[in-house]
A protein has these predicted regions:
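Low-complexity/repetitive intrinsically disordered segments
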Residues: 1-11
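Extracellular jelly-roll beta-sandwich "head" domains, especially the C-terminal globular C1q domain
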Residues: 11, 20-176
Length: 176
């Protein structure tokens, strides 16, 4: 004879037991700092008496660093070997009012990064700057500069506040 009609769906069965735990997944990449370097100067004797308008500050000594990804190419020029985001901190003691700016050369000449200009109107304290810099090509060159638009040279202050040499620092950290 003919096949009969399909019957009603029955009730859901009881939940089964939990299966075995699967294998551990691969370890992910480490987060945080990818590379860092500290460059510094002692005054005296490491910098010229003045840094002319449009001139770069020297940081001729090497502090702690993590590898070759951030390296000097001269006393005042620093290679950022990877495309990425970098946190840049710098401090320099100067005698007069003035400004400093970061420059980045990505192959077409050094460009002053206007968003990194820092300065002070009076006094003889340090000029301190902090900025994030994004590179778009490998081997970009970074400097700390007395802006070309300034009318006066900056005097790097030796022995500020006492008898010991005063340090200036440039710390570069690659974040991604």
């Amino acid at each position: 004879g003919a096949t009969g009609s399909t019957g009603d769906i029955g009730p859901t069965g009881a939940t089964g037991s939990t299966g075995d735990i699967g294998p551990t997944g691969a370890t992910g990449s480490t987060g945080g700092v990818l590379d860092f370097a500290d460059f510094y100067a002692l005054m005296p004797p490491d910098n010229a008496a003045t840094v002319a308008a449009g001139g770069d500050v020297d940081f001729p000594r090497d502090g702690p660093f993590s590898g070759a990804g951030i390296a000097r190419t001269g006393a005042d020029t620093f290679n950022l070997s990877e495309i990425g985001s970098y946190q840049v901190l710098f401090q320099v003691s100067v005698t007069e009012a003035g400004q400093l700016v970061l420059t980045l050369n990505s192959g077409a000449g050094a460009v002053e990064l206007a968003y990194t200009v820092v300065g002070r109107a009076t006094g003889t304290s340090q000029i301190v700057g902090v900025a994030l810099v994004q590179t778009s090509v490998i081997n970009s060159i970074l400097t700390v500069r007395n802006p070309a638009s300034e009318s006066t040279a900056l005097t790097i202050t030796p022995l500020a506040g006492g008898t010991e040499s005063v340090s200036a620092h440039l710390v570069i950290t690659r974040l991604r």
